[in-house]
A protein has these predicted regions:
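N-terminal juxtamembrane cytosolic/stromal segments of multi-pass membrane proteins
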Residues: 1-36
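Juxtamembrane helix-loop-helix connectors linking adjacent transmembrane helices
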Residues: 2, 63-79, 112-180, 197
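Alpha-helical transmembrane segments in multi-pass membrane proteins
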Residues: 46-102
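Functionally important transmembrane alpha-helices
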Residues: 51-52, 214, 221-287
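Membrane-interface segments at the starts/ends of alpha-helical transmembrane spans
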Residues: 68-84, 159-167, 268-292
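Hydrophobic core of alpha-helical transmembrane segments in multi-pass integral membrane proteins
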Residues: 92-98, 291-305
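Function-critical hydrophobic alpha-helical transmembrane segments in multi-pass membrane proteins
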Residues: 133, 158-218, 222, 227
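Conserved small/polar residues in nucleotide/adenosyl-binding loops
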Residues: 306-312
């Protein structure tokens, strides 16, 4: 019986011995193509699997509604976000995790830096600055498309998914500011970027950021997600850890969510409203300062990145 194409490809890859590699210089173009091919297949599988899980979750949620669950209730909002996060992150964790485990022997080829003297605070304005400039790029492209082709205005995704009540606003804040950064850094900067690092740090950062931007699934968020992904990738490579990027990602999502949904997150009065308003004000200050500091921060990051101190061989 003739083997299927998938079985033939699987057999071919099982025969590859990466344990013999001692440095990145040992990787041949065919090896790099093979790694990228595997990641491409993993990406396709994760997208298809995501659609299947999403449809299943929709039917499950519809079953709860038919059973009497109010679509305006907090429980519905919690279930909606939970199911959405499961369908979004689970397929990518499984697909990219499989590639990560397969090429785990290549992890010892990762560049280890002796000098970790990056100034951590410059990443905060860099994060907000790149996000703001990414939004400006989207606005400019939208204007050009409207001018040349008469297309409609690109929908603001944050407005489209805006919570309708205080309770749903709290759920949105929890999932957007705390859940999403953890899973996204695990997927894109740990599983994906680490799998790509054998082909070079810079290509790994750019490709992982590109996939991170595309994974948002809409044009409105692509530019700033891509630029933000570059910052998170720089941090993951520079510190050999996803924790700093995860913290910065959390800070960014927290302030963006509070600023965007300030109205929905307030209204109960007292200390809570004061804290939310203060956080929104602080976020606006950081965003405005970062916006004008963007060119200087970009230059500082570029200079720092090109002066990495590599360990010398004995």
């Amino acid at each position: 019986m003739q083997k299927s194409l998938i079985a033939v490809i699987a057999d071919r890859y099982r025969q590859q011995d990466f344990d013999a590699l001692t440095s990145k210089d040992d990787l041949k173009p065919a090896d790099i193509r093979r790694i990228c091919f595997d990641l491409g297949i993993a990406l396709i599988i994760s997208v298809l699997f995501q659609k299947v899980i999403f449809v299943a979750m929709v039917f499950l949620l519809r079953g709860f509604v038919n059973a009497g669950l109010d679509t305006g209730s907090t429980l519905f909002t919690v279930l909606n976000y939970t199911f959405s996060n499961i369908s979004t992150y689970l397929p990518k964790i499984l697909a990219f995790g499989a590639v990560y485990l397969k090429y785990r022997p290549l992890r010892r080829l990762d560049t280890q830096y002796e000098n970790k003297s990056y100034y951590p605070l410059i990443f905060i304005p860099a994060m907000f600055a790149f996000a703001m400039w990414g939004s400006n790029i989207t606005t400019c492209i939208n204007y050009i498309l409207q001018l040349l082709f008469g297309v409609g205005e690109i929908e603001n995704v944050m407005d489209a998914i805006a919570p309708s009540s205080f309770s749903s606003g709290i759920v949105t804040l929890i999932f957007t500011a705390f859940v999403a950064p953890v899973f996204e850094e695990m997927i894109y900067r740990h599983l994906l970027l680490r799998s790509l690092k054998p082909i070079g740090d810079t290509p790994a950062i750019i490709l992982s950021a590109l996939i991170f931007g595309l994974a948002h699934g809409n044009f409105d968020q692509f530019a700033y997600a891509f630029l933000s992904g570059v910052i998170f990738g720089l941090m993951a490579v520079r510190y050999d850890s996803i924790i700093p990027g995860m913290v910065l990602h959390l800070i960014n999502n927290f302030f963006v969510t509070v600023i965007t949904y300030q109205k929905q997150l307030t209204g109960i009065g007292g200390l809570w409203d004061g804290l939310v308003n203060a956080a929104a004000a602080l976020g606006n200050i950081i965003v405005n300062i970062s916006y004008f500091a963007a060119p200087f921060v970009a230059v500082l990051l570029a200079v720092s990145y090109t002066h990495l101190t590599l360990p010398t061989k004995a």
